[in-house]
Amino acid sequence: PELSAEPSSGSRQMMNHFGSRFLNEDGSWRNLMEQKNSTSDMACLASQFPRLVGLAQASKVYRENEALAKNKSKFTSGGDEVAYATIGNSSCAEGHFFEAVNAIGVLQVPVVISVWDDDYGISVANDLQMTKSDVSEVLKGFQRDEKGEGFEIMKVKGWNYPALIDTYEKAEKLAREEHIPCIIHVVEMTQPTGHSTSGSHERYKSKKRLQWEEDFDCIKKFREWIVESKIATKEELDTILSEVKEFVKAEKKEAWKVYQAPLKAEWNEVLEILTSLKEKLNIPELDGWITDLKQTAMFGIFRRDYLSVARKVMAKITKEEMAEKSKLSQFITKINTENKQRYNSKLYN
């Protein structure tokens, strides 16, 4: 976990829960007007929505307070900011979502909420978790009236790229210029894979549904639109796809190599100590532990594996007085100290 390699969170969060860094190394604020800003996702997803209320309200305060609006700021351009939020259809059933939507409607702050709706919440169909199986139907009471109070609620198909462009352009304009909050219900979304690497949506979807998802896959339809619009030919897209796949494979391989290098050095250090101990002491379990370390390393070296073995060995040699014991103790202390910085620092920022 290095900020230089993963500046979002130093690898403390899931890979898609990324966020911008708002502070410099000395703790001072960066100029947020000179960068794109994103706050990290949370799980369960609706729990990130109360934060959305505050982010959007900040823009309203900046716009309505003349002193703040006139001054050049690191945080606002006269209150013209829009807070974008994304959530899946099933997470809309969580309480924080409705509380936040109500607060946003009351405050009339610049928000664009995207609800990605693929008719499922992992394996649970919409009709089992959302009234009327349709979140925008449920939210109709929030639709703005002739007084202009409330939300502008729009519905658009996820595979229709031109319609998406038109919808988001309209929503962004309303939110930015008039501080009218918008909800975009993006329907007919598809699920390319299972919810996790161990999941498989083939287990709970009909063959008909799976065929529809293949035919209306958003990336496939986007590709068709590019060709139909004569932006690029099928052959050009095939070439780009092939080049991108090779690029990603190479980058993945290099990233893994860089990630494994310091772990390999620590792994070797532990193995050297254990091998030396094996020659001097009769510890029945030691052969098995060394073998396990070597076998697991074939698939990837992880700090928890060799640190766990180091602790087990340390418990076996507590009464011994030897250089290996001192080295192992120092190694464990060093890793534990470094781990406090890696994983425990700044937890309450």
Question: How should these model regions be labeled?
Answer:
Residues 97-100, 166-173:
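Glycine-rich, charged/polar anion/phosphate-binding loops
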Residues 1-114, 121, 125-143:
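Cofactor-binding active-site loop characterized by glycine-rich and histidine/acidic residues
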Residues 63, 75-81, 131-170, 214-243:
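Conserved thiamine diphosphate
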